[in-house]
Design a protein with these regions (language model features):
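A conserved mid-protein helix/loop that constitutes part of the nucleotide-sugar donor-binding site
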Residues: 23, 216-239, 249, 256-262, ...
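Nucleotide-sugar donor phosphate/pyrophosphate-binding loop at the beta->alpha transition
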Residues: 124, 134-155
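Carbohydrate-associated surface elements
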Residues: 46, 169, 191
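Conserved acidic donor-binding segment of nucleotide-sugar-dependent glycosyltransferases
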Residues: 332-333, 337-345, 354-359
């Protein structure tokens, strides 16, 4: 069988980066090409600067210019519907030119366009679920717009020919809440490439910008939303500072909870003990991993845990919540990182104090983690994805015969 021509749909793709999804889709697309597994076209949204079409690292990227996304969730739903209409129109035109064998959509944000295009092309539809609205809101999806998003995700996963989940936790979660048949969801974890994590800054100068030589830096990274659990880390910090004294925090990210988190920091007397950096690019982030004394991932809900993986690959000791996909990235046994009871700020404080006070433990975790992260290889991710494509296309051929 010749390698398939695949159309990947994603609402974000570099240079537009909202979160981890853009990075995931880029690396997957590039590795599908690099491993000779597929010819890959990515259909995504663009801006006033990005070219409408270009070839990047062997990937054909097609962009549809869209207005800046609104921050208000009610307006966002209408914006997503408009984006899907535009992606659908562009996809129809691309299909006439390229004749795709398979459509691969990422998350609910491109579900409608993916469904219509797969129907038009008479080809299989694969979807990757990176997170669910049910999980993000701890099961509260009874009111609009959460109910709408949950409904789209339910329809999308049942309509797809196959669903990809990034962890065994997510496979079970998706199968349960959307009543999917056994075997309909396949686990293909996210990957990492340590070469991508090379810092761009002078690390000594960068560290001096945020901390004195005798101060310890605690790094938190991600979207500033409730489910990421940053409020737990802030709650834990006053006691840590009282015990150890010379501790500062850095929070890298932006989101709807930013104002609340800053207000919480002020209320806890932390304004002079850390910095909210806002959104930062990958180059700066990779440098922050190198200057931090530890990275904390305190999520209440986490399908996978890419931040933890990146931190470990960068040689930064890591503490994660004992929840979701983080359990697979940082297995039990304190071999590659520490885990704390999810939602428990007091236990988090204990683990942070322990790690900052034990250099032998820190060094051992860093050494073990550097080997552990090698098992999350993007080439393996691409090959597993290509095998799934082959299985789905084979099933489609048998059905059509």
């Amino acid at each position: 069988m010749t390698k398939p021509r695949v159309l990947i749909l994603s609402w974000e793709y570099p240079p537009i980066v909202e979160g981890g999804l853009a990075r995931h889709v880029r690396k997957l697309a590039e590795q599908l090409v690099a491993t000779g597994s597929a010819e890959v076209h990515v259909l995504t949204r663009g801006d006033d600067v990005s070219p409408a079409e270009e070839e990047l690292d062997g990937v054909f990227v097609h962009r549809v210019r869209e207005p800046r996304r609104p921050t208000e969730l009610g307006e966002f739903i209408a914006w997503v519907e408009h984006m899907n209409a535009d992606l659908l129109a562009a996809g129809v035109e691309l299909g006439d030119r390229w004749h795709f064998d398979l459509v691969h959509g990422h998350d609910w944000l491109v579900a409608v366009a993916g469904d219509h295009l797969a129907n038009r092309f008479r080809c299989p539809l694969v979807v990757t679920v990176h997170a669910t609205e049910y999980g993000r809101h701890q099961g509260w999806v009874k009111e609009h717009p959460q109910s709408h998003i949950h409904g789209v995700e339910n329809w999308m996963t049942n309509r797809a020919d196959r669903v990809i989940a990034c962890s065994a936790y997510m496979r079970d979660h998706i199968s349960d809440i959307y009543s999917l048949d056994e075997g309909h969801v396949e686990v293909i974890p996210n990957g990492i490439d340590p070469i991508d994590l090379v810092p761009a800054d002078d690390l000594e100068t960068l560290r001096a910008e945020f901390a004195e030589p005798d101060e310890r830096l605690i790094l938190l990274v991600g979207r500033l939303v409730y489910e990421k659990g940053f409020h737990l880390a802030l709650e834990a910090l006053p006691g840590i500072i009282e015990t150890l004294g010379n501790v500062r925090f850095l929070i890298a990210g932006s989101g709807t909870a930013e104002a609340d988190l800053k207000a919480q920091a002020t209320e806890l007397g932390l304004d002079d003990h850390g910095t909210f950096l806002g959104w930062i690019g990958d180059d700066k982030l990779h440098s922050l991993y190198r200057i931090a004394d530890l990275t904390v991932v305190p999520s209440l809900y986490e399908p996978f845990g890419l931040v933890a993986l990146e931190a470990m690959a960068s040689g930064c000791p890591t503490i994660v919540a004992d929840t979701g996909g983080l359990r697979e990235v940082v297995p039990e046994g304190e071999r590659v990182g520490l885990r704390f009871n999810g939602g428990d700020a007091e236990h988090l404080a204990i683990m942070i104090e322990r790690l900052l006070s034990d250099d032998v433990l820190r060094d051992r975790l860093v050494a073990e983690a550097s080997e552990h992260v090698l098992s999350f290889d993007w080439a393996d991710v691409a090959r597993s994805t290509a095998q799934l494509y082959s299985d789905v296309l084979g099933s489609e051929a048998k059905t059509s015969a």
